[in-house]
Amino acid sequence: MSFSMSRRQYADMFGPTTGDCIRLADTDLWIEIEHDYTVYGDEVKFGGGKVIRDGMGQHPLATRDEAVDLVLTNAVIVDYTGIYKADIGIKDGNIAAIGKAGNPLLMDGVNIVIGASTEVIAAEGKIVTAGGVDAHIHFICPQQIETALSSGITTMIGGGTGPATGTNATTCTPGEWNIYRMLEAAEAFPMNIGFLGKGNASAKEPIAEQVRAGAIGLKLHEDWGTTAAAIDACLRVADEYDVQVAIHTDTLNEGGFVEHTLKAINGRVIHTYHTEGAGGGHAPDIMKVASFPNILPSSTNPTRPYTKNTLDEHLDMLMVCHHLDPSVPEDIAFADSRIRKETIAAEDILHDIGAFSMISSDSQAMGRVGEVILRTWQTADKMKKQFGRLPEETGRGDNVRVKRYVAKYTINPAITHGIAEYVGSVEVGKFADLVVWHPAFFGVKPELVIKGGMIAYSVMGDPNASIPTPQPALYRPMFASYGAAIAKTSITFLSKAAFERGIPDKLGLHKIVKPVGNIRSLTKNDMVFNNAMLQIDVDPQTYEVKVDGRLITCEPAEVVAMAQRYFLF
């Protein structure tokens, strides 16, 4: 017997469906659901008098062999692969299936079997994204990890050894001993982690030994001397071992200008950190490197988006992070050369047109580790407010823009650092790192952060209350953040050379260990929704930025979305 209900009633019960639109937080961004993989009339829902009961939505005979370990029901998935509604089945810590969950004895189209061994997360009315990948981490303090996790970041790539002066300025874990100790420290955290070694040496062996020790990539930083010889040696090692190189170029142009750096790179793939220049790099025209096919460009979140306070904040920030002395005129000039309103304004637009491919934090070293996702969506909203819908949009929503921006902190950094086989998207076979959001809090405060198929962080009320919701509701670590569960639900990434040398056994690592790879053949064309290669020029006198001969600029925002109304308490 059929039953008719209004869209409003349906959305309230099972969540929105195909053609429905959802507003993201308090922004002007809307998503339109492109497809619904659940089956009308056979939807699953947990609760008293609901569907997921023995012999109904739950298969009465299915053992663990047939059933999934966890199912997220009626989720709206926001991913580079699409914006759609589906159930998500998780088994052995991986995404086993996406589609229709339930009992195939009674229901049509079931590809996710719910049984007695299945846990349920009710995701109707919620948005699910892949866990974020922050590929610009200074590992200055371990408390960064819980801050990042509670914001929806589940993978951190960078370098450091704690609050050492070198780490405060550069993302390097230098040398075998330091790499080993940091790999051991990573065992304690419910976070996927990969470390970058120091790439600043003009000979290969001091660099190569760090890759063999476990570094998944190398960092070239001007504070260690990013000379042409160091760039070439580092990239030769990277080509040999199939790892990525991240570069922070020479702000002062002491060793050469941007053209000399490009000549030293010589067409080899490289990840350019804070390509906008405010975080460092050839002044004033580092951003022109984003024109080239071998450059995978990212920028960091303090300049995201450009607001009326951005310039004032950056000067003091820069002085501290790079160990500069405000009483030394040359140090002041160094700082001033980086902070340019014209290039920061252009950065907004270069992200919006897909010329800049990634956004990361630069944690505690001119960046906020818990605001990568927040500032990504603030940038997207500012661009829509100032320039309207993208011309590529076809439906009622902002789906193209949303896919472009979600890719900046999920799939693209995963591709760049050779880990997209494991993380970075909501796809079958990938590690089940998922973030559940209420639409009103999307991008600001997640409800649940799932690591490897188990809840690692959540908003949780008073533990002494009779129900989970009474105040104070705070972010608290959940069971995947404790004990041996950490090792089963989080990944340590290593170079293939270290993996094959048996470094995990040598150090007694218990976390899941995965090798990185498929890096050295990458080009900007591999940056999903963010592969625009345009001619970018910066006027050396006025700092004005032109793209294909056209001036690009925008006004600073006076007010941003996703801000004070969410952070009163």
From Swiss-Prot:
Keywords per UniProt: Cytoplasm, Hydrolase, Metal-binding, Nickel
Binding site residues for Ni(2+) 2: 219, 248, 274
EC number(s) stated in the UniProt entry for this protein: 3.5.1.5
Name of this protein: Urease subunit alpha
Domain Urease residues, every copy: 131-569
Catalytic activity: urea + 2 H2O + H(+) = hydrogencarbonate + 2 NH4(+)
Catalytic residues as annotated in Swiss-Prot or TrEMBL: 322 (proton donor)
Subcellular location: Cytoplasm
Keyword Transcription regulation found: no
Cofactor dependency: Ni cation
Organism: Geobacillus kaustophilus (strain HTA426)
Enzyme kind, highest EC tier: hydrolase
